[in-house]
C-alpha cells in the first residue's frame, strides 16, 4: 500500500499571519515571543490540515521564519565571518537574511528557476561545520506531541553545496564529508 506525504507546506499562513508578525517584530512593535507563538500556531494548523486530509507522514522542519536554506546554514554552523560577532542568535539570523547597519545581507537567488528565493550559503575551503539540530528536534517533538507521524525535511548536503557560493573559489564539494 502506498503512503502519502508532501515535501513542504506553505508557511506564511492563509491570512499572512507570519508576514505580519515578522514585520511587527522588525518594527519593534512585537516581541520575538509573539512571533514564536504565531509560528507555533501556524505549524499546528498546517499539520492538522494535513492530518485531516489523510497525509500519512506529516512534514516537519519545513517551517521557517525566513528561509529553509538559511535554517540549514544555521543548523550546520556555516555562519559567514561578518556575522559571527553577533551573539544573539535571533538577531544574527535576521541580520544574515536582511543585513543590518554594519553588515550586508547574504545574497538571495532563485530556487531552481522558481519565484522562490533562498539565502545563498557562503562557503570557503577551510570551513568547519558545527551542527545544531535543536530546531529539528523541537519541531519533531512538537508534532509527536500532537499525535502525528512526522517525517523530517532536510536540504541534503549535495544540494546545500551545489547551491552555495564558494567565496574563495574553492571546490565546495570537497567539504561534503565534513558536513556528514
What are the roles of these predicted feature ranges?
Residues 1-180:
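Domain-level signal for soluble alpha/beta catalytic cores
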Amino acid at each position: 500500500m502506498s503512503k502519502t506525504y508532501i515535501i513542504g507546506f506553505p508557511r506564511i499562513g492563509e491570512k499572512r499571519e507570519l508576514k505580519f508578525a515578522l514585520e511587527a517584530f522588525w518594527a519593534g512593535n512585537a516581541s520575538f515571543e509573539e512571533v514564536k507563538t504565531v509560528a507555533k500556531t501556524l505549524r499546528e494548523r498546517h499539520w492538522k490540515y494535513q492530518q485531516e486530509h489523510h497525509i500519512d507522514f506529516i512534514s516537519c522542519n519545513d517551517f521557517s521564519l525566513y528561509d529553509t536554506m538559511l535554517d540549514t546554514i544555521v543548523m550546520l554552523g556555516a555562519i559567514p565571518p561578518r556575522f559571527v560577532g553577533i551573539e544573539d542568535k535571533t538577531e544574527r539570523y535576521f541580520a544574515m537574511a536582511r543585513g543590518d547597519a554594519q553588515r550586508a545581507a547574504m545574497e538571495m537567488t532563485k530556487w531552481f528557476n522558481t519565484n522562490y528565493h533562498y539565502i545563498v550559503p557562503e562557503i570557503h575551503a577551510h570551513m568547519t561545520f558545527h551542527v545544531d539540530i535543536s530546531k529539528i528536534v523541537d519541531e519533531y517533538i512538537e508534532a509527536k506531541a500532537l499525535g502525528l507521524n512526522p517525517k523530517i525535511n532536510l536540504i541534503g548536503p549535495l544540494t546545500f553545496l551545489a547551491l552555495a557560493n564558494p567565496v574563495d573559489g574553492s571546490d565546495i564539494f570537497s567539504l561534503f564529508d565534513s558536513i556528514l
